[in-house]
């Protein structure tokens, strides 16, 4: 490092101090900040004013097109669109526009922490219990985010990327500017010009599927503050604290004649010309320039995910920590470039191999230029840093090796003529093409290749609404929120697919935690095996009311199928003076109306399940006349009981009695009477025994609860499929009664049917659910079904599943992708995504989300609490039992202990 010394000379002791000696004390030492080009930012025009106080610049932040599991055809289309943007969006001038792109990773999830906290506060239910649960959940998530950003990474990803996986955010910043002369006689001022070009640029980028936003001085300052103060003493190197502590004041709070550049450096930068490095906070920094392309680049060359050997990663993933990539394009008029190429062609005369190669290259360049493939002067620079000169040299060697392996030829540090100047020239908005006369660093690159090199490719980040927080393979947050109307096109109904071992249970516990914490949603869970018992205990721990029900003969649980019969009768009589069962049958079959429930149709379906026992063969024999008889019996049962003055609901035995009455009706044909008797006998099986316990009792009303968990219990066993379907229908009716009554509050309702393949095997249940969920869309009630596979789903479920906008598939095997295709039209791109999902036990599972507005591959790395609550394996139960015995605590407290242990690993 260069010696630090006072400016000027030490006066001799035997001579008087002269005015010249005193003047040296007042000299302003040269500073790197003096070379930074911007002097001000205008909020009204959203432009930066450059050092000449005349030229203007615009800054943007880019979110690249998702490249995970994308086909080569898709990437080629993106490349073509980017090339069009380069060629035709930014006009060419003799004094040209410059487009600079910078890529850097922020090893921090502080923005996600703030976003989640703000999002939760804006949506959380304002009761003491929900606020307590929400604050605890957010705090745990924030600790999880902090743990993810540790320098060593959270884990080694041996399955996909082949490197350490760490939480971070990849930031791509773009600068567009043109230096103008005061007397250039152009008819448009620089600010108007830059904004017109910027508007076209933004429009074209958005049309390509690239996210783009305009940035201001706060964005520039926050970024460069981290760049130039990598180990600030004031915060002991904590860059998140630094950006909070040293945030840029608002315009009205800034001191007179403030200089944005001077505010950026908390310690004086210094340089070491011998080693060609700048020192920021005593850390050496170096610029590495790419001299040439050794071979044609691939689409998304730097930031797109691609296959390399057995691994999938982006080139930028492998660069050393703290690296910054810069691509600087000069939008030069093509006639000037063509003249230059022609000069090369004319001078390439001779029989030497070098001359012949130059001639061939020049001819090839002119050919492609004639086809619209522009040649643009380009400078590619890698900024890197180290903890010491030795560490910097090690990282420089890593960068050079990586560039060479990927077809890019870097200039070796010992061959770099002006390394300190190179660093300064390539800083944001600092490059001036007209001054590059000697030691030219720019190289002519075809726009088709630039369209592959530019960092406009990336990984999906979702919609940005942290209702559900996941990550991508690069460690960046991937968030979306089905319950947010901005993220959905139609509804928030969801289907979650995942074979055993795919992490489906952990995913659903994690989803429930977020839904109850962020929205305070009313939760209903239908499950098998007690997978969500601990989740219920967790909610109860914070004061939420929890009702856990098991479908077992010893439990006082009643789900009467015909409880809505009186309401049905009232509605039908109100609609028409003379009730016509046949007309109602036609209306029920043809209605797509979601304004009002089809109560009679729902009860008919329940009766049909009782009559057929859920047997598909018997259901196939069910005629229209049979259905009409069933409806008549339900209506007669309601009318008779109402006429008798009974206040008790209509029970199954009442419908059986009505059916027996129809079997004795002499006005009917013998065949119909016989069929009515058969159906009455079949339904009578549900009036006694276990079935009668569940479906032929008034029972007691279910308590109001924040969380209701119904364990299928006995009915999940083989041979009880019909009763399970009826039980599921009964709970749906219970839920519907609540959400209809509470439809004017702000609270959403989330209904999860776990192990849905056990429930939906009966085609009639799918028809029933279609009827009921049509209403739920307008009641803010969202049904999610989770299942191991779709193989057991009948074809009749297609209409139901077509109503579900959100499909989440966890690590699906090939056969399951084929099953998905039975119910949902999949594009080749979507099939490719589904095939690409991977898992690494103990670290992560991947899945694919498909909705109308979002299609992406995500990585589930839930917080330890979600994992601990989802642990239902025998060895996991043994672990909790040991903790309970050792610490004399409850099972939930043992869960917290397991979560804390996972957090400290």
Where are these regions (language model features)?
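Conserved lysine of the Walker
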Residues: 504
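A short helix-turn-beta junction within AAA+ P-loop NTPase domains corresponding to the substrate/partner-engaging
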Residues: 545-547, 797-810
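Hydrophobic anchor at the beta1->P-loop junction of P-loop NTPases
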Residues: 496
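Hydrophobic positions on the alpha1 helix immediately C-terminal to the Walker A/P-loop
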Residues: 507
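Extended, folded cores of ATP/NTP-driven motor/assembly subunits in large transport
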Residues: 1-444, 455
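Walker A (P-loop) phosphate-binding loop of P-loop NTPases
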Residues: 501
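Conserved H-loop
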Residues: 528, 754, 778-781, 785-795, ...
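P-loop NTPase motor domains
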Residues: 77-88, 314-317, 420-478, 484, ...
């Amino acid at each position: 490092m260069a010696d630090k010394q006072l400016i000027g000379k030490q006066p001799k002791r035997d001579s008087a101090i002269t005015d010249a000696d005193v003047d040296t004390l007042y000299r302003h030492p040269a500073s790197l900040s003096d070379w930074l080009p911007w002097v001000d930012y205008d909020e009204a025009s959203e432009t930066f004013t450059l050092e000449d106080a005349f030229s203007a610049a615009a800054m943007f932040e880019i979110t690249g097109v998702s490249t995970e599991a994308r086909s080569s055809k898709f990437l080629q289309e993106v490349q073509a669109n980017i090339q069009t943007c380069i060629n035709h969006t930014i006009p060419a001038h003799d004094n040209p526009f410059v487009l600079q792109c910078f890529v850097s990773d922020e090893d921090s999830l502080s923005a996600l922490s703030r976003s989640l906290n703000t999002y939760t506060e804006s949506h959380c239910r304002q009761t003491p219990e929900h606020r307590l649960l929400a604050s605890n959940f957010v705090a745990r998530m924030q600790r999880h985010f902090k743990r993810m950003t540790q320098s060593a990474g959270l884990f080694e990803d041996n399955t996909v990327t082949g490197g350490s996986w760490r939480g971070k955010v990849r930031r791509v910043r773009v600068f567009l500017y043109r230096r103008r002369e005061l007397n250039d006689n152009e008819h448009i001022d620089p600010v108007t010009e830059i904004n017109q070009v910027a508007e076209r640029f933004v429009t074209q980028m958005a049309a390509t599927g690239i996210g783009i936003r305009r940035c201001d001085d706060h964005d520039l300052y926050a970024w460069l503050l981290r760049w130039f103060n990598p180990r600030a003493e004031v915060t002991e190197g904590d860059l998140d604290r630094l950006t909070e502590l040293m945030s840029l004041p608002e315009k009205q709070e800034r001191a007179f004649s403030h200089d944005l550049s001077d505010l950026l450096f908390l310690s004086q930068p210094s340089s070491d010309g011998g080693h060609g490095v700048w020192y920021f906070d005593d850390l050496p920094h170096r610029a590495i320039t790419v001299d040439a392309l050794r071979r044609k680049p691939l689409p998304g060359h730097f930031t797109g995910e691609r296959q390399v050997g057995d691994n999938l990663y982006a080139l930028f993933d492998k660069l050393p920590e703290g690296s910054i990539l810069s691509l600087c394009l000069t939008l030069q008029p093509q006639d000037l470039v063509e003249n230059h190429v022609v000069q090369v062609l004319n001078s390439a005369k001779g029989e030497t191999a070098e001359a012949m190669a130059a001639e061939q290259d020049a001819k090839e360049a002119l050919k492609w230029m004639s086809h619209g493939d522009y040649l643009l002067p380009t400078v590619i620079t890698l900024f890197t840093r180290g903890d010491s000169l030795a560490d910097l040299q090690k990282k420089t060697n890593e960068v050079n090796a990586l560039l060479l392996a990927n077809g890019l030829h870097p200039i070796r540090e010992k061959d770099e003529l002006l390394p300190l100047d190179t660093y300064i020239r390539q800083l944001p908005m600092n490059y001036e093409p007209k001054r590059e006369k000697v030691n030219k660093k720019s190289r002519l690159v075809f726009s088709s290749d630039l369209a592959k090199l530019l960092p406009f490719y990336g990984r999906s980040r979702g919609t940005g609404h942290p209702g559900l927080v996941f990550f991508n393979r690069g460690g960046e947050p991937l968030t979306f929120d089905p319950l947010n109307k901005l993220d959905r096109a139609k509804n928030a109904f969801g289907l979650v697919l995942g074979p055993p071992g795919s992490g489906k249970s952990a995913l659903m516990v994690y989803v429930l935690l977020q839904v109850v914490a962020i929205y305070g949603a009313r939760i209903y869970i239908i499950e098998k095996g007690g997978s969500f018992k601990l989740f219920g205990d967790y909610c109860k721990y914070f004061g939420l009311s929890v009702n856990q029900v098991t479908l077992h003969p010893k439990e006082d649980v009643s789900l009467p199928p015909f409880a809505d019969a009186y309401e049905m009768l009232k509605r039908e009589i109100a609609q028409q003076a003379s009730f016509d069962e046949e007309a109602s049958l036609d209306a029920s079959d043809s209605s797509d109306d979601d304004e009002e429930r089809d109560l009679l149709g729902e009860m008919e379906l329940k009766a049909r399940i009782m009559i057929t026992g859920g047997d598909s063969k018997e259901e196939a024999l069910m005629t229209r006349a049979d259905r009409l008889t069933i409806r008549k019996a339900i209506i007669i049962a309601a009318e008779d009981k109402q006429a008798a003055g009974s206040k008790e609901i209509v029970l199954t035995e009442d419908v059986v009695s009505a059916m027996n009455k129809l079997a004795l009706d002499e006005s009917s044909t013998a065949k119909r009477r016989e069929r009515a008797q058969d159906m009455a006998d079949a339904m009578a099986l549900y009036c006694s025994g276990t079935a009668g316990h569940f479906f032929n009792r008034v029972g007691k009303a279910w308590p109001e609860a924040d969380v209701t968990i119904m364990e299928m219990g006995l009915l999940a066993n083989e041979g009880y499929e019909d009763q399970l379907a009826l039980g599921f229908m009964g709970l749906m009716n219970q839920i519907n009664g609540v959400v209809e009554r509470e439809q004017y509050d702000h609270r959403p309702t989330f209904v999860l049917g776990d192990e849905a393949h056990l429930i939906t095997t009966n085609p009639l249940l799918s028809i029933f659910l279609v009827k009921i969920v049509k209403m739920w869309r307008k009641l803010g009630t969202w049904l999610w079904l989770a299942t191991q596979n779709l193989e057991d789903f009948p074809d009749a479920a297609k209409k139901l599943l077509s109503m579900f906008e959100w499909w989440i598939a966890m690590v699906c095997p090939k056969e399951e992708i084929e099953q998905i295709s039975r119910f949902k039209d999949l594009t080749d791109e979507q099939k490719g995504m589904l095939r690409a999902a991977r898992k690494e036990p103990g670290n992560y599972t991947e899945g694919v989300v498909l909705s109308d507005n979002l299609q992406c591959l995500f990585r589930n790395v839930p917080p330890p609490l979600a994992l601990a609550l989802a642990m239902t394996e025998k060895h996991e139960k043994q672990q909790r039992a040991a903790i309970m015995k050792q610490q004399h605590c409850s099972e939930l407290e043992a869960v917290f202990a397991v979560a804390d242990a996972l957090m400290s690993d």
